[in-house]
Amino acid sequence: MPRRRVAAKREVLADPKYGSQILAKFMNHVMESGKKAVAERIVYGALDKVKERGKADPLETFEKALDAIAPLVEVKSRRVGGATYQVPVEVRPSRRNALAMRWLVDFARKRGEKSMALRLAGELLDAAEGKGAAVKKREDVHRMAEANKAFSHYRF
């Protein structure tokens, strides 16, 4: 346990176009090497593509996609008497969002479309419909937790 005080959580400023804190945080996940303007261009470009493809509100689609990706439970390794058990634990809301954003960006980067904006738009639309690689990752994590339910009494 740390001896110092716990660092205060900094508030993220809402993004200028949509006024959403979650979107601003997502831009920080997309950003590489401190290039925020590039990250903004990618995210706004992706949301414009989502709007083009007939979805009414791109921000609503984005939030729906995040909900579809965010895991409810995950497994943590716990060592008990020489054996390591995968113990299912509930995921904190802040970690849920962080994992969802991380998975969304990671799997968007692995897609085959030309630009990152197109890849991100494709992954967002897939996730909002309950399919795509990021949603599959969530299902895998849930399946792992379900398989190790027997060890849930080894709480943290």
From Swiss-Prot:
A GO molecular function held by the record: rRNA binding
Signal peptide positions on this chain: none
Keyword rRNA-binding: yes
Top-level division of the source organism's lineage: Bacteria
tRNA-binding is among the record's keywords: yes
One Gene Ontology biological process: ribosomal small subunit assembly
UniProt xrefs under SUPFAM superfamilies: Ribosomal protein S7
Keyword annotations of the record: Ribonucleoprotein, Ribosomal protein, RNA-binding, rRNA-binding, tRNA-binding
GO cellular component, as recorded: cytosolic small ribosomal subunit; ribosome
InterPro entries, sorted: Ribosomal_uS7, Ribosomal_uS7_bac/org-type, Ribosomal_uS7_CS, Ribosomal_uS7_dom, Ribosomal_uS7_dom_sf
Function per UniProt: One of the primary rRNA binding proteins, it binds directly to 16S rRNA where it nucleates assembly of the head domain of the 30S subunit. Is located at the subunit interface close to the decoding center, probably blocks exit of the E-site tRNA.
Record note on quaternary structure: Part of the 30S ribosomal subunit. Contacts proteins S9 and S11.
Similarity comment: family membership: Belongs to the universal ribosomal protein uS7 family.
Protein name as catalogued: Small ribosomal subunit protein uS7
Organism per entry: Pseudomonas aeruginosa (strain ATCC 15692 / DSM 22644 / CIP 104116 / JCM 14847 / LMG 12228 / 1C / PRS 101 / PAO1)
